[in-house]
Amino acid sequence: MSAPGADFDTERDLRAAQKAEVLVQALPWLERFAGAVVVIKFGGNAMIDADLEAAFADDVLFLRRVGLKPVVVHGGGPQITQMLAKLEITSEFRGGLRVTTPEAMDVVRMVLTGQVQRRLVTMLNARGPLAVGLSGEDAGLFRAQRRSAVVDGEPVDVGLVGDVSRVDPLAVADLLDAGRIPVVSTIATDEADPTQILNVNADTAASALAVALGATKLVVLTDVEGLYSAWPDRSSLVSLISAAELEAMLPGLDAGMVPKMEACLRAVRGGVPQAHVIDGRAPHALLLEVFTTEGVGTMVLPDEAAAGASSE
């Protein structure tokens, strides 16, 4: 604080003024989202960059401390690939899906629940002892049905891979009611064989969980700024899009963006008021999305809400 009568220090005092402006701007959003469930899909480069991972943990704990109810859902593709290579287990993708043999499934399970999740829980708990790890197989959280890939128009068996078909959110809801931060790894129990575990896509699992919890927001972290209408033209970043507009764009999107945007579409069509894709490479992007008027990335809204927002 400047002493009374002290000379104005431009750098110091403007920085303080900017911080005050940020706090003032955040207030209505703090009030609006008090008690709101926010499902965050953590992935991309933020999972393998220590500084970004630390910033993410700071953001999640901040959300919890100011009264929101964050739920973290994670995958672990790069870590799974690395471990499979280390163990000399063949790993290939068919039609965009990882071929998952029983041997590979053991590695998927080990990496997601024993490595990636443990690291996230540890980082969060270092900032406040609130995080609890859950697997999609715990308490019947995720059930899935096996699926195949499509290659050259033909179905191809990809092993122990499934689509989430049912969600029982009770265990997650109980943790939220207890003031905890659930950290969920995305494997699921096979609907047809409860003794078998399936590998499921983390984006679609996060979307299904957001719907089941009645979340206020789904936020998907990725490695681009958001959705582009004419990629790679960076000036074509879409800040707001309706569910109908997004559905029309899906067939022409880059393969890597399709599951993320489908997850957002399913979420808002399932009753989640807002879904977002944001750049996980930007430190504190999560806080910028939730607590600033401009937000970041791309926001997907139900058709009626998008029409109202566009006319404002």
From Swiss-Prot:
This protein's superkingdom?
Bacteria
Q: In which pathway does this enzyme or protein participate? A: Amino-acid biosynthesis; L-arginine biosynthesis; N(2)-acetyl-L-ornithine from L-glutamate: step 2/4
Under Gene Ontology molecular function, one entry of this record is: acetylglutamate kinase activity
Predominant location? cytoplasm
- Give the UniProt keywords, A-Z: Amino-acid biosynthesis, Arginine biosynthesis, ATP-binding, Cytoplasm, Kinase, Nucleotide-binding, Transferase
**Which InterPro entries would you find in this protein's record?**
AceGlu_kinase-like_sf, AcgluKinase_fam, ArgB, Asp/Glu/Uridylate_kinase, Glu/AcGlu_kinase, NAGK-C
- Keyword DNA damage in record: no
Q: What GO biological process term is on the record, naming one? A: arginine biosynthetic process via ornithine
Q: Which GO terms describe its cellular component?
A: cytoplasm
Q: Respond yes or no to whether keyword Cell wall biogenesis/degradation is given for this record.
A: no
Reactions listed under catalytic activity = N-acetyl-L-glutamate + ATP = N-acetyl-L-glutamyl 5-phosphate + ADP
Q: Which Pfam families match?
A: AA_kinase
Localization (cell): Cytoplasm
Q: Which amino acid positions bind substrate, per UniProt? A: G76, G77, R98, N199
Q: Where is this site: Transition state stabilizer?
A: K41, K260
Enzyme Commission (EC) number: 2.7.2.8
| Physiological role | Catalyzes the ATP-dependent phosphorylation of N-acetyl-L-glutamate.
Give the UniProt family note: Belongs to the acetylglutamate kinase family. ArgB subfamily.
- Report what the protein is called: Acetylglutamate kinase
Q: Which gene encodes it?
A: argB
